[in-house]
Amino acid sequence: MKRYFVTGTDTDCGKTFVTNQLVNYFSSSAAIKPIASGCEYSKNQLVNSDALLHQQQNHLPLEIINPWRFRLPVSPHLSAREDGASIDVHKVADYCLNLQLNDIKKLFIEGAGGLMVPLNEQDTWLDFLKLTRIPVILVVGMKLGCINHTLLTQEVLEINKIKCQGWIANCLDQDMLMLDENISTLEAKLKYPLLARTNYGGKISDICLSSL
């Protein structure tokens, strides 16, 4: 089973939407979101809305999709602390590397926030990737400032020798000035391919998804 880690340029760049689009596009694929904050109680358990969206597609138990759940809608390390818990990045890494799902050929692992979001007082998603070496798919929320955020993310990945399989342009605002020019600028400056583009909540447009 191939595994990909879906990260983004920042919070609310559209990781969950794009991840679901990837699952729709590829047969025999599934998605999980191992860590989520901002969960609410429903039927005596904490539930995350992003994890529920994945469940609607995967039909997997929430315990498999989202084993680490916390209440407050803040950074995972703070939300876990408020719940009297802590996140062990080694356990998260082991879970994502060893999870086996019948008939699934591609597993998309959605992170929480961006690459440098703290999971505890010492570790970030970058440390998770150093442990697992799972290749990254970078979701770029196309908005003012995204070029800077994207190039900074690329630099961190390169310095730490983390493989990036490619990036996806998630077009958030149909009124964004010079959208196509921004995408072209990123294509010229990034060292990995543009895999696909999504337009304002529409279906994913394949550009180079066959490389996955």
UniProtKB/Swiss-Prot annotation:
The lineage of its organism: Bacteria, Pseudomonadati, Pseudomonadota, Gammaproteobacteria, Legionellales. Belongs to the dethiobiotin synthetase family. Catalyzes a mechanistically unusual reaction, the ATP-dependent insertion of CO2 between the N7 and N8 nitrogen atoms of 7,8-diaminopelargonic acid (DAPA, also called 7,8-diammoniononanoate) to form a ureido ring. Its cofactor is Mg(2+). GO terms for cellular component: cytosol. Pathway: Cofactor biosynthesis; biotin biosynthesis; biotin from 7,8-diaminononanoate: step 1/2. Transmembrane segments: none annotated. The keyword DNA-binding does not apply. ATP binds at D12, C13, G14, K15, T16, F17, D50, E110, G111, A112, G113, N170, C171. Mg(2+) binds at T16, D50, E110. Keywords: ATP-binding, Biotin biosynthesis, Cytoplasm, Ligase, Magnesium, Metal-binding, Nucleotide-binding. Homodimer. GO terms for molecular function: ATP binding; dethiobiotin synthase activity; magnesium ion binding. Its EC number is 6.3.3.3. One of its GO terms (biological process) is biotin biosynthetic process. It comes from Legionella pneumophila (strain Corby). It is found in: Cytoplasm. Substrate binds at S37. It catalyses: (7R,8S)-7,8-diammoniononanoate + CO2 + ATP = (4R,5S)-dethiobiotin + ADP + phosphate + 3 H(+). This is ATP-dependent dethiobiotin synthetase BioD. Coiled coil: none annotated. InterPro entries: DTB_synth_BioD (IPR004472), P-loop_NTPase (IPR027417). The active site is at K33.
